[in-house]
């Protein structure tokens, strides 16, 4: 799972991806909700696409709306302490078990370990889809909320949808839920899921080599690639990139453009941009957003559908050379890309930014900042030094041409 430090590059390279408990998904079946009920044969939940993530909104009480990020790369569901407190299980046995349970050790995307408290959520609703007695881990989503500019109440892991046919329809900004035994044919390219424990692992191809990758809607990256055994060739890079955050801390990123074509079924991505990893390779939101992706856990298969089979092109990745941890009052520099204009201007980790192009950072949400990076030649950052402010003009550059 990736989590902030916020990497405000062309697309902010961070957050969730591949969070799992140490014993799941590879050694035992992840927990499923106690009961899943669909109020109709087709439940459509509106979603907002932010930085390649699908954020669903749910309303079922006067305390809502609630916002959840859908993370197929996670074998656990996370909720905030406030939501867990509001909806504790009323089942005495379940509640007692959760109250006495030890912290759960969770592995993040970089292989680090964090410990989170377990709980059972009495109720979770997505439109007409009701999930009861949901096993969860408690996590403070404040940093994630600050990054996205939306209050996030939880992260919905893949096992939550075990008893449904789950469709992440990125082009139409929606999530569709159907009964698991739905037999209607789904258009598109269908691939088998590779793991008996229902983890969304598929075989993809790089040139003439096949490898296993996790379908990870909780990552905003296009492809995180473990190069071991593949010996990939690069058209550009790899080079040092963003500072990204995980459950266990910040880490630098290595990014580059491959010289080969990646294939998912019969869909192709020529010369894609990849982030290098020493963990499991993943297909992230920057690629998934081109598709409607349907997960059929009942039959161990996934279907990719889009309106065209034209190659999916990867545009250049532009950057201001800095990554941030965000707060309402300022953005703190979390990392600086080596040999970037920002590094040459003397920007350092820990510096505080209060304004961008003369406007307070409170006026800069995720979408607006991304649009600026995509079009601007320079940015003017105002830095806070004690009680004094100073401005530095930083060139935007192509991190990966």
Which stretches of residues belong to each language-model region?
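Pepsin/retropepsin-fold aspartyl endopeptidases
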Residues: 19-401
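Bacterial N-terminal signal peptides
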Residues: 7-18
């Amino acid at each position: 799972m990736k989590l902030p430090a916020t990497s405000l590059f062309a697309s902010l390279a961070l957050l969730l991806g591949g969070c799992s408990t140490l014993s799941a998904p590879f050694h035992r079946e992840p927990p499923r909700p106690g009961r899943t009920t669909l109020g109709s044969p087709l439940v459509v939940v509106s979603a907002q696409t932010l930085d390649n993530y699908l954020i669903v909104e749910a309303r079922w009480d006067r305390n809502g709306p609630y916002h959840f990020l859908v993370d197929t790369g996670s074998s656990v569901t996370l909720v905030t302490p406030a939501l867990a407190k509001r909806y504790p299980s009323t089942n005495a046995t379940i509640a007692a078990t959760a109250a006495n349970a030890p912290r759960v050790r969770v592995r993040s995307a970089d292989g680090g370990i964090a410990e989170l408290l377990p709980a059972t959520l009495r109720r979770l609703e997505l439109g007409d889809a009701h999930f009861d007695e949901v096993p969860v881990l408690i996590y403070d989503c404040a940093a994630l909320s600050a990054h996205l500019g939306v209050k996030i109440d939880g992260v919905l892991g893949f096992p939550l949808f075990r008893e449904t046919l789950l469709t992440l329809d990125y082009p139409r900004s929606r999530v569709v839920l159907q009964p698991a035994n739905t037999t209607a044919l789904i258009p598109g390219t269908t691939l088998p899921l590779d793991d008996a424990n229902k983890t969304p692992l598929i075989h993809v191809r790089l040139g003439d080599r096949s490898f296993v990758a996790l379908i990870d809607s909780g990552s905003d990256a296009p492809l995180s690639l473990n190069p071991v055994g593949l010996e990939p060739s690069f058209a550009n890079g790899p080079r040092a990139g963003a500072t990204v955050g995980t459950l266990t801390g910040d880490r630098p990123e290595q990014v580059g453009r491959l010289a080969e074509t990646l294939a998912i079924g019969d869909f192709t991505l020529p010369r894609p941009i990849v982030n290098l990893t020493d963990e499991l390779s993943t297909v992230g939101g920057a690629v998934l957003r081109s598709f409607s992706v349907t997960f059929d856990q009942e039959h161990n298969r996934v279907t990719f559908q889009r309106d065209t089979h034209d190659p999916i092109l990867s545009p250049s990745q532009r950057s201001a050379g800095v990554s941030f941890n965000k707060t309402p009052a300022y953005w703190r520099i979390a990392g600086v890309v080596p040999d970037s204009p920002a590094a040459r201007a003397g920007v350092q980790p820990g510096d505080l930014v209060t304004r961008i192009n003369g406007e307070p950072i409170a006026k800069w949400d995720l979408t607006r900042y991304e649009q600026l990076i995509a079009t601007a030649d320079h940015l003017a950052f105002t830095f806070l030094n004690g009680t004094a402010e100073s401005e530095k003009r930083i060139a935007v550059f192509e991190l990966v041409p």
